[in-house]
């Protein structure tokens, strides 16, 4: 259990039907969750509009729907989400992710970035309408404080207060282990 000072969100990862997503969302509202993310298949934008219209808790999406950043404009126009989702790997790069952030800002909507990485950290730092940085994945088989083998250190270490800072190294700030890359090239 956690206290009231801990913010809770849920990523339901497409598991629910419309009626089950509604029941889940209403339960989460009673528990004080901040949002419900992608509870249904994202191919049905009308289902998301229906859900957003019927819940008080913000509905977040789309995360993995096709259409890169252009499709997210349709979601905003339709009112299919209360908080827009983007990410460098989801929409085709840093520039499309920033375009998505600015699109949401033009609609007066928060836009949250999906996943960590140095690229996503820079997108979050460059915008005003993103409140959270999704660092790590709480999973029984993954350790989010372990970096990639090709890096000498984490791209996004968390400080003792729970904050992540943009690194001051050149470029995206990644500390690349070029010896590892050289020793693991396919020849």
Residue locations for each model-derived region?
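Metal-dependent enolase-superfamily TIM-barrel catalytic cores that perform enediolate-based chemistry
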Residues: 1-49, 54
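Short, flexible active-site loop motifs that bind/organize anionic cofactors or intermediates
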Residues: 11, 87, 110, 167, ...
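Electropositive phosphate-/nucleotide-binding environments in soluble metabolic enzymes
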Residues: 18, 42-45, 94, 114, ...
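Proline-centered helix-kink/hinge sites
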Residues: 39, 58, 167-170
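C-terminal extensions of enzymes
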Residues: 148-187
């Amino acid at each position: 259990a956690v206290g009231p000072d801990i913010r809770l969100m849920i990523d339901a990862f497409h598991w629910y039907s419309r009626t089950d997503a509604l029941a889940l969302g209403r339960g989460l509202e009673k528990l004080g969750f901040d949002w419900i993310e992608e509870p249904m298949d994202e191919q049905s934008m009308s289902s998301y509009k229906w859900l957003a219209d019927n819940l008080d808790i913000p509905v977040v999406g789309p995360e993995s729907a096709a259409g890169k950043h252009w499709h997210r404009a349709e979601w905003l126009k339709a009112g299919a989400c209360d908080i827009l989702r983007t990410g460098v790997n989801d929409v085709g790069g840093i520039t499309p992710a920033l375009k998505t952030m600015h699109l949401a800002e033009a609609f007066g909507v928060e836009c949250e970035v999906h996943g960590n990485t140095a690229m996503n950290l820079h997108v979050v730092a460059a915008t005003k309408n993103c409140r959270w940085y999704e660092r790590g994945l709480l999973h029984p088989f993954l350790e989010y404080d372990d970096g990639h083998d090709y890096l000498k250190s984490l791209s996004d270490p968390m400080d003792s207060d729970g904050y992540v800072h943009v690194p001051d190294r050149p470029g995206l700030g990644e500390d690349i282990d070029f010896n590892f890359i050289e020793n693991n090239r396919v020849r």
